[in-house]
Regions:
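Small-residue-enriched hydrophobic alpha-helices in membranes
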Residues: 1-166
Length: 166
């Protein structure tokens, strides 16, 4: 069983960051305005709550959730996120987020091979939930689509980065 102790502090921060980057990649693919962006960001937080109460969550997922419950864990993930994205142009954010997810997937495969598949499926689930959080296009939520073409393409990129089926 992999745990936080299976990773160096730098590696663990990459694992934590991947949870946020999985959602940021989708949000950056097609910004949804203020309300849509708020809904999409809330979904990632909700995924942490779901995983905490899900008895089927892997020990590694539970360790990540536990770290996000501490101010130190949140600060480490936030600081890494800022270091990765600060100074990025809007068009670069998605590419950097997908790259961070890809790096985390490789790290998980190397350090936690028994739990990597479940963790990567969880990251993909977060991405899908973010994509479905708000409608794209239309007016006041009418006439839009649940997942835009840009978001579908990004979900495919994330699936490829994770090595999972979308």
């Amino acid at each position: 069983m992999a745990s936080k102790a299976s990773f160096s502090p730098e590696e663990w921060t990459k694992v934590l960051q991947s949870v946020m980057m999985a959602g940021i990649a989708v949000t950056a693919a097609e910004p949804s305005g203020l309300w849509g962006t708020l809904k999409e960001s809330m979904v990632a937080g909700h995924a942490l709550l779901e995983a905490k109460s899900d008895t089927k969550s892997s020990e590694l997922i539970k360790a990540v959730v536990a770290d996000f419950e501490t101010s130190e864990g949140r600060a480490a993930a936030r600081d890494r996120l800022q270091a990765t994205l600060t100074g990025s142009k809007p068009g670069e954010v998605k590419a950097k987020a997908v790259a961070a997810v890809r790096d985390a997937a490789a790290l998980l495969d190397a350090k936690a091979p028994d739990e990597a598949a479940a963790f990567k499926a969880w990251l993909r689930h977060i991405s899908q939930a973010v994509a479905e959080a708000s409608t794209e296009g239309g007016f006041l939520g009418f006439g839009g689509v649940r997942v835009s073409e840009a978001e579908k393409a990004t979900l495919a990129e994330i699936s490829g980065a994770l090595g999972v089926k979308g």
